[in-house]
C-alpha cells in the first residue's frame, strides 16, 4: 500500500498578498499589529434572472454558468414576497448566488483580474469610487462570456452578474489601497 502525499500549493494571488502586499500596506498605513492589515473575507457572485418569473427554465442556464465560472454549486434565490406588477409570486426562483471563501476565492479573483477583465471590450478600468464606506467593493459585468470557462457556442442568452469583494478594511481608502495592490485596474480620475 502506497501513501500518496499530496502537496497543496497556495494560490498565486494569496502568496503575493502574504509575501508582498501585507508589508506594503503595513508600511503605508503604519499598522502596529499585523492583524490590523486589511484582507479579503469573501467574494459573492450574484446573477439576477428576472425573466425566470415568466420562464422557470431560464434559472437553469444561470445556475450552470455560475457553477462553471466559480467551480461551486450556486444557491438559487427565491422571491420573498409577491409583486403583482412583475407577475411575481412568493417562492419563484429569481436569481442565483455563490459565496466564495478560502482558496477558491483567491483562485477566482486571480482568474477575474488576469483573464476575464482584460477580455472586456472597450474596458477602461473599474470605477474606484464605488466602495461602500467600509472598504467593500461591488461591480457588475454585463456578460458572462468574458470568463474563458464558458463555451461561447453553448451560451443560450447573455447574462450579467454582480461581484462583491468583502474586505476587513475599515475605511474606503484602506479598501481601495488593498484592491489596488491586489491588481484591480481602477480608472485614474
UniProtKB/Swiss-Prot annotation:
The keyword Protein biosynthesis does not apply. GO terms for biological process: translation. This is one of the proteins that bind and probably mediate the attachment of the 5S RNA into the large ribosomal subunit, where it forms part of the central protuberance. In the 70S ribosome it contacts protein S13 of the 30S subunit (bridge B1b), connecting the 2 subunits; this bridge is implicated in subunit movement. Contacts the P site tRNA; the 5S rRNA and some of its associated proteins might help stabilize positioning of ribosome-bound tRNAs. It comes from the Bacteria. Belongs to the universal ribosomal protein uL5 family. HAMAP family: Ribosomal_uL5_B. The gene is rplE. One of its GO terms (cellular component) is ribosome. The keyword Protein transport does not apply. Gene3D superfamilies: 3.30.1440.10. The lineage of its organism: Bacteria, Bacillati, Actinomycetota, Actinomycetes, Micromonosporales. This is Large ribosomal subunit protein uL5. NCBIfam families: PRK00010.1. InterPro entries: Ribosomal_uL5, Ribosomal_uL5_bac-type, Ribosomal_uL5_C, Ribosomal_uL5_dom_sf, Ribosomal_uL5_N. Keywords: Ribonucleoprotein, Ribosomal protein, RNA-binding, rRNA-binding, tRNA-binding. One of its GO terms (molecular function) is structural constituent of ribosome. Part of the 50S ribosomal subunit; part of the 5S rRNA/L5/L18/L25 subcomplex. Contacts the 5S rRNA and the P site tRNA. Forms a bridge to the 30S subunit in the 70S ribosome.
Amino acid at each position: 500500500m502506497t501513501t500518496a502525499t499530496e502537496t497543496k500549493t497556495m494560490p498565486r494571488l494569496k502568496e503575493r498578498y502574504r509575501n508582498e502586499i501585507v508589508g506594503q500596506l503595513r508600511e503605508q498605513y503604519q499598522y502596529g499589529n499585523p492583524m490590523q492589515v486589511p484582507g479579503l473575507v469573501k467574494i459573492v457572485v450574484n446573477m439576477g434572472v428576472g425573466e425566470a418569473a415568466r420562464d422557470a427554465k431560464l434559472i437553469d442556464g444561470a445556475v450552470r454558468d455560475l457553477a462553471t465560472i466559480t467551480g461551486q454549486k450556486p444557491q438559487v434565490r427565491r422571491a420573498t414576497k409577491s409583486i403583482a406588477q412583475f407577475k411575481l409570486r412568493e417562492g419563484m426562483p429569481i436569481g442565483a448566488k455563490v459565496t466564495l471563501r478560502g482558496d477558491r476565492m483567491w483562485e477566482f479573483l486571480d482568474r477575474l483580474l488576469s483573464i476575464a477583465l482584460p477580455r472586456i471590450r472597450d474596458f477602461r478600468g473599474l470605477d474606484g469610487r464605488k466602495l461602500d464606506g467600509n472598504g467593500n467593493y461591488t461591480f457588475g459585468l454585463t456578460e458572462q462570456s468574458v470568463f474563458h470557462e464558458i463555451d461561447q457556442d453553448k451560451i443560450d442568452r447573455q447574462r450579467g452578474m454582480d461581484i462583491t469583494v468583502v474586505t476587513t478594511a475599515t475605511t474606503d481608502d484602506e479598501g481601495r489601497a488593498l484592491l489596488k495592490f491586489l491588481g484591480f485596474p481602477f480608472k485614474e480620475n
